[in-house]
Structures are given as structure tokens and as C-alpha cells.
Amino acid sequence: MGLKKFLEDIEHHFEPGGKHEKWFALYEAAATLFYTPGLVTKRSSHVRDSVDLKRIMIMVWLAVFPAMFWGMYNVGHQSITALNHLYSGAELATVISGNWHYWLTEMLGGTLSTQAGWASMMLLGATYFLPIYATVFLVGGFWEVLFCMVRKHEVNEGFFVTSILFALIVPPTLPLWQAALGITFGVVVAKEIFGGTGRNFLNPALAGRAFLFFAYPAQISGDVVWTAADGFSGATALSQWAQGGNGALINKVTGEAITWMDAFVGNIPGSIGEVSTLALAIGAAFIVYMGIASWRIIAGVMVGMIAISTLFNVIGSDTNAMFNMPWHWHLVLGGFAFGMFFMATDPVSASFTNKGKWAYGILIGAMCVMIRVVNPAYPEGMMLAILFANLFAPLFDHIVIEKNIKRRLARYGK
């Protein structure tokens, strides 16, 4: 009760006419973080519900935690394994002293030797992920608050989700200044200039990643950015398949074949939060059960992916190994699972009619496979497929609504 009374006592200072009026957006953000606002909709139609936008966003934020924690562990695991493969003894000590992620891990009680356990791996992964997330949150939060102060409205909670999603779809070695640029583009260009939360037609996190991909491709693609080990170069499993098919899926450190279960669990290099389909499915099950994510979109993506990948399997190719990738491998490689569960289901940039959701999902699944298979320069396709489908989402809804109007007119007359 003490905190609530304190917030109520200072509220009048931030209301119109108060001495801190211009800082209302910051006060409202802090107050509603702990308590549900007492505001209600003044005009029809409205629905009373105990779950507001902030609670919905917090649930989505929590839903990505399994993928986030596994991603940090996997970054540490891949990096420590690669370091001990490349260096030993004095060489390893020299490498550790020259990389602040490494020596910070050891200073906090971790080890980068072959005896490293899960705690050391998690700790090393955290030294890569948390700075990226903090940078994205602070820079993106600055733009959110700035636009809210200019427009004189409350801070929208959607950024809690945008920030963590963006941090999870980039490589662990991404320079922090590029992370700041990417989230700036996503928040300002893809969302705020169109009116802010609820008015953007593109997914802000994906738009920010697309900006980095085209502006700074060397730091977000290739073979050297996925494993945070100095001097190590290794392609993602998706790139390996594109180069040589299933037989090319080899762990570069151990020399062992990468199995489907390795990819499903997430024991492969890749973007921080995209590697584990299992962890992503756990989080997705939660938001689908809570009614936040649409199962129709997820099912549509699967239908589109399975249909087109099967078609390419039937056609076959002696020169393009991606033609022969079966649907169950498309599911676990690259950013397909992350995009299907957490990006395609964005309620703002996706279709909102039930039939439109099916068409929207099918388009994403089909486009992803087509880009992966047909485009020789870009083996990943989920990011571009979702952004492409975002442009068609209003059209799908328009067609569904118009057909519904015509059907009702035909049934009941004009």
C-alpha cells in the first residue's frame, strides 16, 4: 500500500497543469507497471477484462524466456567448445585476456576450460546477450518515450516485446552500436512514424533486423558471426545444407553429424533465440493457450511450408540441395520456428479476420520455402517472408470483409 499511496500522492504533479506535466509519460509507465490504471473506455463499444495491454505484453515477454535462457546457454556452449578446439594452455589464456566477455566470465567465477559446466556456459552467453538486450531496451525505450512526450500520451507496452524479440534474432557477436541502429530503425521508421503501437503495418523487430541485414551484412550473416569464439568460423546448419545437402550437416568442432534432434533441441550455432525449436514451442504453447497468439496463423504457416517444400521435393534438383530439404528440416533450421511462433502472430501487423489469418499464414510458409530454395544468395527466408506478408495482411482482411458483406446482402437483401 505504501508504493500505491506514494504514486497517488505525486500523480497531480504530472497531470495537465502540474509542474512535471511534460514527464507524464514516464510517470504513467512506472505507475502502470505495478498497478492496473483506473481508466475505462468512455465510448462504445468496449469490453471489460482483467487483462489489459500491459499484461498481454508481459505474458508474451515471459513466453520467450525458455528460448532466451537456452539461447544464452547455447552461445556459451558453442563458444567454449570452439575455444578449446582452437587453443590450449597459454594460447587460451592469451585469448581470454584479450576479450572482455571471456575475462568477465572468469572474474565472475566461470571457467572456459574443458571442465566448464552449464553455469559457466550460461554466464558466458549472458555476457553476450544481456549487453545487446540492454542496449536495445535503452535506445528503443528512449525513442518510445520521446514520441510519447511529443504526442502527449502514455508509453505503450508493446516495446517490452519488441526489444526482447529483436535481441533474440541477432547473432551474439553483433556490435552494440549496430544493435542500437537496428532498433532505432525498427521503432522510429517501422512503427512511430505510422502512429505508434497498433498502427504499424510492419513488424518493428523484423524491420530493424532487415535494416541491419541490408546495411551491414558482414555482421549479421556469413560464417564468422554465429559462434562467439575468437578466430573461429563456422556456417549455420541451414547454410551447410544449402551448400551440400543433408550430408554436409557436420559439427565443425567435433566432426560429428548434426542430427534432426540436435537442431530441434538447439545444439547448433545461430541467432541467440532462434536455435531451439523445442524451447520456442513451449513458449508458443503458453501464448496460444492464453489466446494471445492465433493458432490459425501458426497452422497456416505450417500448411504453406509443408505444401511448397513437398512440391520442391517432388521436382528435385541435382544442382540445388535445398530442393531436397524435407519439411521437418525446414521447421528446425534457421529462424522458421521463431518467426512462425512469435513474429507471424504479431496481432498488429498480421491479418485479424479468421480466414485472413489462414491466407496470411499460408503465404508466409510458402514464401519462406521459396526464398530458401530459389534464392541462391540467401538461404534464410523467414524474415523477408513475414515482412512481405505484412504488406498483404490488410488486403486479405479487405477481401474477407467484402465477401462477408456481399454474402449477408444476398441472404437478407438490401
Curated annotation (Swiss-Prot):
Its EC number is 7.2.1.1. It is found in: Cell inner membrane. Its cofactor is FMN. The modification FMN phosphoryl threonine is found at residue 236. GO terms for biological process: respiratory electron transport chain; sodium ion transport; transmembrane transport. Composed of six subunits; NqrA, NqrB, NqrC, NqrD, NqrE and NqrF. This is Na(+)-translocating NADH-quinone reductase subunit B.
